[in-house]
Amino acid sequence: MWPQISDAVISAATLVFIYCFTSFGVIAILGGVSHRTVESEIFTQAVRLGNTETATALAVLQAIIICAVLFITRRRSHPNSTSLHVSTPQSLRSKPNRRVTPLMFVMTAVLVVASPLLATVYRSLIINSELSLSAWRSIFSGSLPALSVSSLSVITTSLVFAIAAACICVPLGLLVARSSAQRALFSLPLVISAATLGIGLIITFNSSPFAWRSERWLIPVIHAVIALPLVIRAIDPAIRAIPISLRNASATLGASPFITWVRVDVPILRPAILRATGLSMAISLGEFGATSFLSRSGSTTLPIAIAQLLGKPGVATQQAGFALAALMVLVTVGVMSRA
């Protein structure tokens, strides 16, 4: 069995390593001073200490390690692993353990994913071991304790950025998904960490003639860049599934390539476009790493506000942070379900 699944296991392990090695939000909120990673140290050196040279060196070191891991795992893949040996199917009824084991894995995965979300909602409703809606009342009244921005401003900013990111990302994904070379180029954000992207933004847009680091419009653009690889993967299978005969028939009837695209491609791609729109908006709503390098007082998003609230002392302040986190989960789920 191992030769048949080795490539899939190695690919999955590589993705897990990359996502853990480049994790920033969890470390920034829960790690504190005693638990620093390369990612959090890049942020500390670049933003808090202003030492872009050290931050750049760490970012380059991180990129080298990621490239080395990708190279090693690619070399270990088995070229003949796709040839499967078909055996006689066996009934699962005679071996109940084969049904129980996958079910246990699924239940464990659901529990691991759902527990933090349920705990967030619970903490937003409980203060000093008693049920309290004070955090939710403060959010819906428009005020956030210990912050200079209102909850309405934070929510509005996040939604505007998410819509703008989707408007940039989805059309670009439709264009890029047609070319394999472009797909490879625009897939780089998958293996480039948020801190590396952030330090690159600081270096590139911190001086004339491109002194755009404090511009609000740069944040949704970066969100679109981060979401683009996943949007391409959501759109590409639908584009490949369009029958070429439909396009040929449209061209035979005298339709131009643009009319063919509007009348043939777009109706078929509509479900994929909606999924890509919801996906890009969800990624924008939850993006924390690169936004931390660019956020200003007038561009505070939901993840930034949550991190600021949870990082301040006070039971009421932290409960407001949990309530805002629960609200972000509801907004994200709503966006994805509508898409």
Each language-model region and where it sits:
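Interhelical loop and adjacent transmembrane-helix boundary motif
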Residues: I27-C67, R98, S124-L147, T291-A339
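Transmembrane alpha-helices
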Residues: M1-T22, L103-A114, L188, V225, ...
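Membrane-interfacial helix termini and adjacent extracytoplasmic/periplasmic loops
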Residues: I27-S34, S87-S91, I126, L133, ...
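Transmembrane alpha-helix signature in integral membrane proteins
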Residues: W2, L58, Q62-R76, L147-A184
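Cytoplasmic-entry segments and transmembrane alpha-helices of multi-pass inner-membrane transporters
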Residues: S94-F105, L175-L201, R247
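C-terminal transmembrane helix and the adjacent membrane-cytosol boundary/short C-terminal tail
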Residues: V26, T56-S94, V176-S180, D236-S245, ...
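N-terminal signal-anchor/first transmembrane alpha helix
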Residues: A63, C67-L70, S91-A119, A184
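Hydrophobic alpha-helical bundles that form the membrane domains of multi-pass transporters
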Residues: M1-I66, I239, N248-L253, I259-W261, ...
